[in-house]
Every structure is written in structure tokens, then in C-alpha cells.
Amino acid sequence: VTVPQSIVFNGDLGSGKSTVSVEIAKRLGMRRVSVGDLYRQMAQERQMTALQLNLHAELDQAVDGYVDQLQRDIAASGERLVMDSRLAWHFFTDALKVHMITEPGEAARRVLLRPSGPAEQYTSLEEAKARLVERSESERNRFIIRYGVDKAQLRNYDLICDTTRAGAAEVIEHIIAAYEGRLCSEVLREAPPLLLLDPARVYPTEDIVTLRDRQDAGSVGDVAAAGDEPLEPLRIGYTGEHFFVVDGHRRLSAALQNGYRLVPARLVAEVDEPVVGGMSAIDYFAAQVRPSVIHDWSAAHGIDLPLPKPALLGDGAVLAGEPGASA
């Protein structure tokens, strides 16, 4: 008999890890351990903010050393549990490794609204957003230097879940379905990670006119009738900041028209990995994703995809008067 594995959570600040992991632990009858709570307690004892403790930990290995050993001991115990930790995926070999993401502005809004200690208060949305980015980068750099692992690399995980618009209940149901083998088990088994993405945050790489010429009139209704779980996973690339379609524009369009907040996908390439013909994900995005393509896709689906930084787009990508260009 196979012993059920643990579930370990990492993710963006403000992505809802605590809310989701607490409920999943209750639903599955598992003990939950939060390393974030431990770090916050350590910061309060030192009268530091979480960011200050992160920066201090870059110089003082004792901070991470204590927490690392705790995680190693828990992983070695073989106990089936839910672990909320930014590095548990590195220590737990036999676990469902979940990484939760959200749009940075939405993450800042959530953090700004939740109760916090006096050391963690922010005066504005922009300050919260900037501090969250700074704190995340501090952690990322520390992990790269100390452990030689990059927490931003999606292939470290089994399941990526975007919580920008999806509610906690929907996210919880999807994660439990994946854990129990009821959601895209082939992707999880053979080619993780499984991506559960917000369709309104995925960039097209084809012109909407071309898509309309090939659109199957029944596809929108077929997707609505089937539900999002049976939807064939899209094939997706990732620049390190933006997700984009490699294959599956019609399914993505149908999901948007049906109001889905999550769609399943498999990762084709991320950052420097090749998409097609040796072209990296970053270069493919720059070659295929034009301001006019973004503008027309957004207008057709009633969404607001932001223009990426000009450096991520091809030559002359943002021109005065071009659709989607800033005024």
C-alpha cells in the first residue's frame, strides 16, 4: 500500500498560501506546519520586520540553519503533513509541491488589507508592492547563494496555481483533486508542473483575426458543457514574468468567454529553455507578442492584459499611436 504523500506549499507573498494550506490540512486530516509563522515570530523577537530578518539572514546563517534542520527532521520523519514553507520543496522529495502565484498589484492589495503587526505596516499600495518585491528578491537571492536553487523556477514544483481571481474554495478543490489523482494526472506524473492559470493573464501569440478564421463555432459551448477540469491542457511558455500560449488559443478563448478563472496547462519552456527551433521562451515571446496582438485580444475578450516592458517585446514594439501604446 502506498503511503499518501505530504503537500508542501511555496508561493508569492499575498497569494493565499496560509488560507489554502490551513483548509487543506483540515479537509485531509493532516498536521500543518508553517515556517512563515516561525520566521515572523523570530522577527518579532528581534524587533525586526520580515524584510529586515531576510536581509539579516543573508549575513547570519544561524537563522536559516535552525529552520532548515527543522524541515529536514520533519521530512525524514515520514509524517504525512501540510507544510507552508518557501523551501520545503527542496527538503521534501516525496510530496506534492505546490507553488501559488498572483498578480503583484493584487498581492499588495491583500497584504495591505490584512491585519499586521506594527513592524509590517505599509502606508500605500505602491509601498506594499515595492516591499513585497524586495522581500521576495531577498529570499530568492539568499536561496540561490546558500542552496544553489532558484525558487522562481517553475520546474521545481508539481503544481502551479494562480490565485489572482480564483477564490480560495476553487483553489482548494483543484489542489485536492490533483493530490488525489483526479486532475490532469498524466501531466503531474509524466511532465510536471501542471499549471492552473488565470486565462485573463495569459498572453496570445497569434492575431485574433487568424484565430477567428479557424474558430469552431461549437467550441465555446463545448467547453462550457465540459467544465474546466476535463479541458485539454494548453501548452504554455513562461518568460520568468509572463505566461504565453504556444498551443491552445481556441481553448483559451473559449475559457475566457465562459468566465473561467483557472485553466489547466502544461509547461513547454521557461526563460532560456527552447520553445521551437532553438528559440528560447523569452525570445519567442519577444518575436510573437506584439502590442497590436495584445490590444485586439484584450478587446475581443473584455480583459485588460498590460503591455509588457518594451525590453521583452521585439524591435519597435511600442510605437506612438499603435494600439495598446501608452498615451
Model-derived features: positions:
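Small-molecule kinase domains that catalyze NTP-dependent phosphoryl transfer to phosphate-bearing small molecules
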Residues: 120-171, 196
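Hydrophobic positions on the alpha1 helix immediately C-terminal to the Walker A/P-loop
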Residues: 20
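Post-Walker A helix-loop "phosphate-sensing" segment adjacent to the P-loop in P-loop NTPases
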Residues: 26-33
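Conserved glycine(s) of the Walker
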Residues: 16
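ATP-dependent small-molecule kinase phosphotransfer cores
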Residues: 35-92, 105-106, 117-120, 130, ...
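P-loop (Walker A) phosphate-binding loop of NTP-binding proteins
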Residues: 12
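Hydrophobic anchor at the beta1->P-loop junction of P-loop NTPases
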Residues: 9
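Short, charged/polar connector segments at secondary-structure boundaries
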Residues: 177, 181-326
